[in-house]
Structures are given as structure tokens and as C-alpha cells.
Amino acid sequence: MSNRVTLGLDADLLAFGVRSKIRWDYARCPHAVVFGATGSGKTYFTRLLLAKIGKFIPDSEIVVCDFKSDDDFSFLSGCPGFFRFDGCSEGLEAAVEKLKARQRGADASRSFFLMMFDEWAAYLNSLDKKAAEAAKQKLSYLLMLGRSFNVHVLISQQRVDAAYFNTARDNFSLVVGLGRLSRESVQMMFSDFRDEIDPVKPRGQGTALVGDRIFNMVVPQVTTPLTVEEAILSAVQRPERRRDGN
């Protein structure tokens, strides 16, 4: 089984008519952060990536923490792996417990598990100082120890800031910045390649750092959004189906 998921197309090669896929090797690059301002296509890309995980990684399980709590993930309402707004702390704890169970041997499986947290920064800002620090420590635990147990983290938010990640920034080995990027974001997330990056890109295009390789990326358009939602739904519902024996 391949450990790779397609992220998008190489924009530089696409300009010459060559459709070359940019792939995420999640065994080598276990954790991801996606950022971009409103209108950048960040949510579209995040949904598409979750759908590919649900469809192409057998037995994958996804926990979605949707702090923004608008309509983008409302189709997941009622699923055991879906947490909204002030319920996001429970979703974070569920991911932590998944990793602990695998460490203890209570969960012997090594199937792909992902916690996707939408608007992590806004979530932290909603907490008091003590609770925010505890949440950052839980995230650091997942980022530092998750790889060996096939436990992964995907953070999606409008902008990046070191204050929201403690010392765990270097654990994000897949970084995707979409649309127009600020100079500060480029410096923080793409510092080794800052002189190569055009920070001004249209909606649906961006920069992808996959391990130590940098790409200009185009996110392909999908004409069947219901298929995307069905694929995400299947992965978020998997814990419930396993309990039911299906």
C-alpha cells in the first residue's frame, strides 16, 4: 500500500502542459499545517485532502475539530468523530487518548488516524491562559510522538504564529500556504526558501513545502462536491461502524 496522498499539481510544470502530481508521503512527513487568508481556497483544499484520505487510505479514521463552526463541515453533524466550537477540546482529547491507547498496547492497530483542527489559533485565543497552555502541550505530544503510531495532525488556519505552537513548529513537515502570503508567514514557514517564493498567488494556488522540497502548487477543481463530502463522512464515521461490527 502506498503511503502517499496527492495534494495538487506542480504549477511550474503545468505551465508547459505537464500534469505532475505533488504527493504527501505521510509516513515520512507525518504532520501538516495549511494556512491562507479568507478567499484563498484554504477550506476547499482542506476538504479535498480529507476526502482523498477517506477514499484512498484503507481503514483511515479522521477526527474533525471545527472551531469556526460554520457550514463547511456541517454535513458531519452527529458523527462520533466530529466536534464543533466549544466541543473541540473533546476532539483534541480524543486524539490524545487514541495515541495513548496505542502506546499502552490497548489499541494494537496501526491504521491511519488524523486529527484535523480548523482554526487552532482562534481556539487557543478563546481559552484562558492555563487552558491554552494545556492545549498546546497536548498538540505537542501528538506532533512529537504520533508518527511511530500512524497518528497524524492537520492544522488549518488563516495565519501562522509561533505563539500558537510552542516549540512544535518544526514537527510540521508538510506546509501549504495558499493565496497571498504575508512576509511574516513566508519567513516563519518557508524561511529556507523565502527568496524563491512569490507570495502573491490567486485563489486555489499556493506554495507547498513537502519535507525538504518546495513547489508552486495548483489545487485541482472538483465538480462533484457531494462526492467529497461522502468520502470525508466515511472516515469520520468509521469508529461508529467498527463498534457496530460493520
Can you say where each PLM-predicted feature lies in the sequence?
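Cell-envelope/extracellular anchoring and linker segments
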Residues: 105-106, 242
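Conserved ATP-driven motor cores of ASCE-family P-loop NTPases powering translocation/secretion/packaging/pilus
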Residues: 157-241
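Phosphate-handling catalytic cores of nucleic-acid transaction enzymes
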Residues: 244-246
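P-loop NTPase catalytic phosphate-binding loop
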Residues: 1-105, 111-114, 121-181, 190
